[in-house]
Amino acid sequence: MFIAVEGIDGSGKTTVIAEVAKALPRVYVTREPSGGPIGRLLKEWALRGGTADPHVDALLFAADRVEHYKREIEPKLREGYIVITERYVESSIAYQGAAGVPIEYILYINSVVPRPHLTIILDVDPAEAIKRIKARERLEKFEDVEFLRRVREIYLTRARAEGYPVIDAGRPAGEVAKDVVAIIERAMASLRR
């Protein structure tokens, strides 16, 4: 089973995914940007405060995603793992969409990668997310409260349109993780039918 956990920066994705991975058998956790060459370029660029046209960001994230899927996700799925990725296509839709890139374009450039079996949105108020991010030390280019409000709205709109479960991530991570595990277990049971 292939699962994407999405949400604005500061929504607790990393912490929740770590808890979920402990609760389920044979879980492989990965994230975007990936550890591949394009993903490393994206991380380095962000850390240096680099800015590019949002269309360039969208293309680079899509390129990283294709490489990530082929190099890492697909082989682990074939080996029988539950693969959980922190961020996937919906992150590009939300972030680059909030920066003005048409969603249809983002969907098109990402059409070569398979959709996850399950996408879960962790939802938190952007002001709370910024507090959490500041506790980590530095803000990155996508981390300003007004921008995160736009990103959050796109996530919630997409969740309604696509039927993605939305979890209140303003609660303690352990509670959020329990909800995520329950959703995954239900989805796995329905896939077995």
Curated annotation (Swiss-Prot):
One Gene Ontology MF term: ATP binding
PROSITE patterns (UniProt xref): THYMIDYLATE_KINASE (PS01331)
UniProt record similarity statement: Belongs to the thymidylate kinase family.
Gene assigned in the entry: tmk
The protein's enzyme class: transferase
This protein's record includes keyword Cell inner membrane: no
Keywords from the named record: ATP-binding, Kinase, Nucleotide biosynthesis, Nucleotide-binding, Transferase
Keyword Kinase in annotation: yes
Protein name: Probable thymidylate kinase
Pfam families, A to Z: Thymidylate_kin
PANTHER family per the UniProt record, alphabetical: THYMIDYLATE KINASE, UMP-CMP KINASE 2, MITOCHONDRIAL
Binding site for ATP: G7, I8, D9, G10, S11, G12, K13, T14
GO cellular component: cytoplasm
Catalytic activity as recorded in UniProt: dTMP + ATP = dTDP + ADP
EC number: 2.7.4.9
GO biological process: dTDP biosynthetic process; dTTP biosynthetic process; dUDP biosynthetic process
InterPro entries: P-loop_NTPase, Thymidylate_kin-like_dom, Thymidylate_kin_CS, Thymidylate_kinase
